[in-house]
Design a protein with these regions (language model features):
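Bacterial N-terminal signal peptides that target proteins for export
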Residues: 1-9
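N-terminal leader/targeting and pre-domain segments
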Residues: 25-62
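Short active-site neighborhood of thiol/selenol oxidoreductases, capturing the structured segment around
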Residues: 62-75
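The canonical Cys-X-X-Cys-His
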Residues: 75-79, 129
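Typically the conserved alpha-helix immediately C-terminal to a functionally engaged Cys/Sec
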Residues: 79-93
Length: 167
């Protein structure tokens, strides 16, 4: 009988650990699809470090986390990332928790010094996403380039990324 119990316990344990751990992440409904044409979120406006600091301060004062996204409208990955952030479920979550500043890099001829503000090497591609906490610390400094391949990722992967960094 003890061998039977041991085997039963072992089988129960294997079944238990083989189930994926349930995530607390919000799921993007299948019916929410990316609408074409994709957004053009970048305006050719030159910003200063002072503008960037003001955005960060204002966002934190509004009890939200600042998100800065460097990119350009010619970049398909930038536009796809923006389209995912515009999905109803994602947009609601982002508006409740974050404030986003899209910074146009043009053809790498505008606002490049603002990437250096965060110690980001500009030659590593776009979009570059910077997520800060309410203490003005960059939370994702090691993977700001995660979405330079946004077009090969799912909308849920993109949404999960932002959910992981919410304070």
């Amino acid at each position: 009988m003890t061998i039977y119990l041991k085997n039963s316990f072992l089988l129960f344990y294997l079944v238990l650990v083989s189930f994926p751990i349930m995530s607390s992440n919000i799921i993007v409904p299948n019916e929410e699809i990316l609408e074409k044409p994709f957004p053009l979120p970048y305006e050719r406006i030159e910003l200063s470090e002072n503008d960037l600091r003001n955005f960060i301060d204002k966002t934190i004062n509004n009890n939200k986390q600042p998100v800065v996204i460097f990119g350009a409208n010619w970049c398909p990955d930038c536009r796809i990332l923006s389209a995912v952030l515009d999905l109803q479920t994602v947009n609601k979550y982002m508006e409740d928790n974050f404030e986003i500043l899209y910074i146009d890099l043009g053809r790498y001829d505008i606002n490049m010094s603002l990437m250096e503000f965060f110690d980001i090497m500009p030659q590593q591609g776009i979009p570059r996403v910077v997520i800060l906490n309410k203490d003005k610390e960059v939370l994702n400094i090691k993977d700001t380039g995660e979405w330079t391949t946004a077009r090969s990722r799912t909308k849920q992967e993109i949404f999960n990324y932002f959910q992981e960094y919410k304070e």
